[in-house]
Amino acid sequence: MKTEHILVIRFSAMGDVAMTVPVVYSLAKQYPHVRITVLSRPFARPFFENLSPNVGFMEADLKGEYKGVKGLNALYRRLIAKQFTAIADLHSVLRSSYLRMRFNLDNFNVAHIDKHRKGKRMLVASTNKKLVKQPSSFQNYADVFEQLGYPVKLDFQSMFGEGKGDLSTLPQEVFQAEEGNLISLDDNNLEAPWIGIAPFAAHAGKIYPQPLMEKVIQQLISHYPHSHIFLFGGGQDETPVMDAWAEKFPQVVNASAKLHGISDELILMSHLRVMLSMDSGNMHLASLVNTPVVSIWGATHPYAGFMGWHQSPENAVQLDMPCRPCSIYGNKPCMRGDFACMKNISPEMV
């Protein structure tokens, strides 16, 4: 009899891929006899390679080797050689839909995600808005496996189980807040809490203004002068901002500039007292290691279903405005033109 082997497809983005982890973990533990292979972009490997003995990872470079229809056909030939018995499309975009179509034509057991687009459109409508909570992405992913014949009870605590990541594996410079001043590795000191801040996101509608975030940092340091604040994220434009904060405040370290990728970030995040983030991938990374997250929401809204795993709605900082939410992903221009949903959140609220 053929070994049960599920292919799980989710290519991007980082936060959405991270949200598959609690579901894939729960599936793997509840069906230990079933092999599970996650197909994603190379960045996602750290999420899955040590998740469970029956979970494997397969990377696909969709901008290189598997670009275009020719590339997808080559990828499909590689996939069918793996002898999958079920296909779970957790993405349902053009590329995954093409692969899904090929599997369907070859009579595979295939299911894909229901994104509840109608409900989300009503959530962000400019008129007749209906502020109705949509199913979470976690539930949407679990529903796909149920369609395939694998109902899942979501049961996940942390990528490190009941423990935390090993700090000794991290570069020592991340624990050097200023020249000659090493941070104590005692993350349980109530007087010197470890606090993470991920101040940026992919779109302007999800970013708390820099001057206000700097005031938040100042107030945290005022309340906890011995605290250690680790900054996460930042692309080419954002890194200089975080470097400037680290230069200005001795308690602040630009952690992402010193760590080596997602694996290191997850280890450090597991030791934080709290993470402050936008509606961004870092909210989901911290959630995967059982760290409480205070999240700031502007153009987007937790009701769209993208709240971090097991995060409390009470820790979502947001304003009640008739125009909110105006976007599911935060990528639409502000209809008011002033991003008041972010600018009017005071540092004291945070």
What are these regions (language model features)?
Residues M1-V350:
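Catalytic machinery of carbohydrate-active enzymes
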